[in-house]
Each structure stands twice: as C-alpha cells, then as structure tokens.
C-alpha cells in the first residue's frame, strides 16, 4: 500500500502492538535504558486483554485468566508490577455439556459421569480404538480417534474443537494444541472410567484480579512506561528502509522492530514477495464474544462452575463462562455476568450483519436451554476477535520458520501469541517478549563489542 512520505522519526526500537507482549517488550527496553516507542492502533492499551465497565458490570473482552507454570504467583512475573494481595488463585472447575448433563472437564478423564448408554459406548470404543499414530502427518482428528476412541471423539472432542477453531480437524496437524490439550494418558482415562475424579489439564488453577478485571495485568505492565502512543494504526511497512507508516501519516524509522501484530498481517504489508507468499498458507479462526449482564443471580446448577464447553452443533456457541463465579468484583452481589463465545471464519466476518444476527440467536439458545431468563438480561456487549485461534496446519511450521528467519534479516522480531503464530497462554506471550527482547539486546551488545 502506498502511503504519504513524511520525514521519519528515527527510533532505535519500535514495538508494534500494546497488548501484554508489546507492553512487556516496552518495559524491558525501558528498564535497560533503550530508546523506544510503542505503537498501538486502538485508543487504549491492552489489546485483547482489556476490560470495560458497563452498567456496573466489569467485562473482559472474553474469558481471560492468568495460568502460571513458570512463576508461583502474579507478583513473581518479571516487569509486571503486580501485587499478590490484589489477585485470587482459583481452582478451576469446568464442565462439558453432554447428554443433557454437566460432565467434569476434561471429559476424557471423567467418563464415568456420562449417562448410560453413552458411558458404555465410550468405554467400548476406547477399548477398541485404533493404534496411536506417531506419524507426523497424522491429523488432529486422527490423534483424537486413536487416543480416545471414535465415540468420544464424535460425541465431544471433534465437534467441540471444530466449533472453537472453525475448521475441520482433518486439516490440522496433531500438534494443533500441544500441551493445552489433555493427552491420551491411559492411566488417567482408566481412572476416569473407574469413577476416580480428575481435574487434569494444564490449567487446573488460575489467577484473577479481585477487582477491575484482567486489565489489572495491563495496568501493571504499562505502569511508568513513557513512550506508548495510541491511535497509531500501522498501514504500511518498508522492511528494506526499516520504516513504518501509520494511518495518520506518521512515519517511524527503526533499527529493531518488535511486532506483536498477527504474523500473517505483518507479512501481508511487508512489501516482500517471499513473506507475502509464505503468509498465504497461514490461517486462523475468529471469535465473537457476547458479554451478558443479568439482573439476577446465576441458576443454581451453575454454582461453582467457571466455564462450560458446548459441543452440540445445533447450539451456536462453543463455550459459556461465568465471570461472577470467578470474581465477585465483576458485578454487584444481586446480579451475575457471563460471557458466551461463538467461533467464526474470517470470511464469516465479512458479513456486516453477523454480530447483529448472532446476538438474538445466542440469547434465545441460552433461554431454550434454561440457562437464563431473557427478562433478566440487563445488557449485552459484543466483541469481535478477528484473530482468535491460529491453525496448526501441516504447512504452518515450515512457513513460520521461513518467515521468522526472513524477518530477522531485517531486524524484525515477532513476539507473543499472534506475532509468533502459535497457541500460547498469557504467561507464554509475556515470556516470549521478554526472551526475544533480551536476546536482541545481548546480540546488539555483542556486535558493538566485536566492532570495537
């Protein structure tokens, strides 16, 4: 895209995107006395990790919870400026809506909770499952059927994941979700068949702010940052000239660029034919989240449940989450708040009426299920996440490796979940930014020493 030519503002380090990975990158640059500027396209910082308040309800963009594996608590996260006393650790309770029952998640480790005859069918299918495929060419669908049996795969695992990622699973590789998907662990599956409860999975506990929603994480990361510019939508990049042009015609020149914007979008505006071609093989799903405030407490059957997976293809949404079961600071005690997620393709979003068409369908489906009374609905706030889940197709790894290697030649370093085109947690995104920036700084210092 051709953009107006302005005198570039020369900045040694430019950070694209003001989400948690971009803010982490900026924080590390500032702490290391590096001159930088962060460019965020929206009016506020935070990316998808933002919170808004509507009618005394505190809504995140959708359910965003802090899962930690490297650090013991939020206060231990480097550069985040978080105080543990402002956060609550929650032991996850999630369920799967199958057979008109709420089955504890992960369902594959809790088969005994299934009603008859589904339980017997799943067990028989598991006992007669095909051999687990080690071939790297195996699809995600193959992985599920060989790992858990065809009945459970068809009942829950396949429809749930296809609704979420808006793509047939035979187009994804078995590496699609890596550590985020409960493994076909025979010991745990058989324990579940015997009725021994399991709360397995990577996120058996998580952290959430006592007040203020997940934007408390953003507030900690941005605290004290000096060079964060909002309303700076980058519309053109010249990798050869190392310049970025924003929609309001500001031009920035960099020595090093750290980008948290979706990798596919970065390549498409790069003016590099090789990058544009490689990015054409990358795909992703979108998510539309409906945040709903209710003038009533949650129904008793939802007591203590944090989120609920919904595999039934006749129901428009794939997950329902309950903010008010997670943090009481999300609404007043006499009310409740939930979020409802619908998967979509990027092509679906081209239909301008999509969100308006979906909203009444979602509300009516919730009422038909008996999960709310439409008369209790106080407000609905919809958010569209254009890039929600990146797809681990068989082409993804080769394409991403080529792209990252090529970008490095221009001193461009992608960071975070969407920058690196991966399926990662918030902790992973911050760690990706931290490691990438530190490595770039160390390389630059080594180069200066060698030059001297």
Residue ranges of predicted features:
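Conserved flavin/dinucleotide-binding core of flavoenzymes
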Residues: 3-8, 51, 106-107, 304, ...
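Dinucleotide-binding Rossmann-like beta1-alpha1 core, especially the glycine-rich loop
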Residues: 55-132, 179
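N-terminal Rossmann-like FAD-binding beta1-loop-alpha1 element of flavoenzymes
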Residues: 11-38
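Conserved Rossmann-like nucleotide-cofactor binding loop
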Residues: 21, 44, 264
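Active-site/ligand-binding neighborhood in enzyme catalytic cores
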Residues: 117-243, 253, 260
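Glycine-rich FAD pyrophosphate-binding loop
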Residues: 30-53
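Short loop/edge segments at beta-strand edges and connector loops
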Residues: 17, 89-91, 230-233, 238, ...
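Mid-domain catalytic core of redox enzymes
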Residues: 235-351, 364-370, 449
């Amino acid at each position: 895209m051709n953009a107006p030519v302005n005198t570039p503002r020369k900045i040694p380090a430019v950070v694209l995107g003001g989400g948690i990975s971009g803010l982490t990158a900026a924080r590390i640059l500032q702490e290391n006395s590096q001159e930088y500027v962060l460019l965020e396209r929206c009016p506020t910082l935070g990316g998808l990790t933002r919170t808004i308040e509507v009618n005394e309800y505190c809504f995140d963009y959708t359910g965003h919870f802090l899962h930690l594996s490297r650090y013991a608590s939020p206060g231990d996260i480097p550069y985040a400026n978080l105080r543990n006393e402002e956060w609550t650790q929650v032991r996850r309770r999630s369920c799967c809506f199958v057979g008109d029952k709420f089955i504890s998640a992960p369902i594959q480790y809790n088969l005994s909770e299934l009603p008859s005859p589904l339980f017997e069918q799943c067990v028989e299918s598991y006992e007669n499952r095909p051999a687990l495929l080690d071939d790297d060419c195996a699809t995600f669908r193959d992985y599920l059927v060989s790992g858990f049996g065809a009945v459970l795969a068809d009942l829950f695992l396949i429809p749930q994941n296809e609704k979420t990622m808006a793509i047939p699973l035979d187009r994804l590789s078995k590496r699609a979700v890596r550590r985020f998907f409960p493994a076909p662990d025979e010991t745990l599956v058989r324990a579940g068949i015997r009725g021994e409860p399991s709360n397995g999975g990577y996120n058996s506990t998580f952290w959430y702010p006592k007040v203020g929603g997940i934007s408390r994480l953003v507030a900690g990361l941005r605290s004290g940052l000096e060079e964060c510019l909002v309303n700076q939508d980058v519309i053109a990049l010249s990798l050869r000239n190392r310049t970025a042009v924003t929609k309001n015609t500001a031009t920035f020149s960099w020595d090093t660029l750290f980008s948290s914007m979706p990798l596919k979008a970065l390549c498409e505006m790069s003016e590099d034919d090789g990058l544009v071609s490689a990015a054409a093989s990358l795909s992703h799903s979108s998510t539309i989240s409906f945040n709903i405030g209710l003038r009533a407490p949650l129904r008793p059957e939802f007591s203590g449940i944090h989120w609920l997976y919904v595999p039934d293809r006749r129901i428009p949404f794939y997950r329902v989450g309950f903010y008010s079961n997670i943090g009481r600071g999300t609404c007043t005690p006499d009310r409740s708040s939930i979020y409802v997620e619908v998967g979509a393709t990027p092509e679906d979003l081209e239909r301008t009426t999509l969100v308006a068409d979906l909203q009444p369908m979602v509300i009516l489906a919730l009422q038909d299920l008996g999960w709310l009374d439409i008369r209790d609905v106080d407000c609905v706030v919809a958010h569209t996440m254009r890039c929600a889940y990146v797809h681990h197709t068989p082409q993804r790894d080769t394409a991403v490796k080529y792209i990252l290697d090529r970008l490095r030649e221009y001193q461009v370093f992608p960071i975070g979940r969407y920058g690196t085109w991966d399926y990662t947690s918030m902790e992973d995104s911050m760690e990706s930014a931290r490691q990438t920036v530190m490595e770039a700084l160390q390389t630059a210092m080594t180069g200066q020493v060698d030059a001297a």
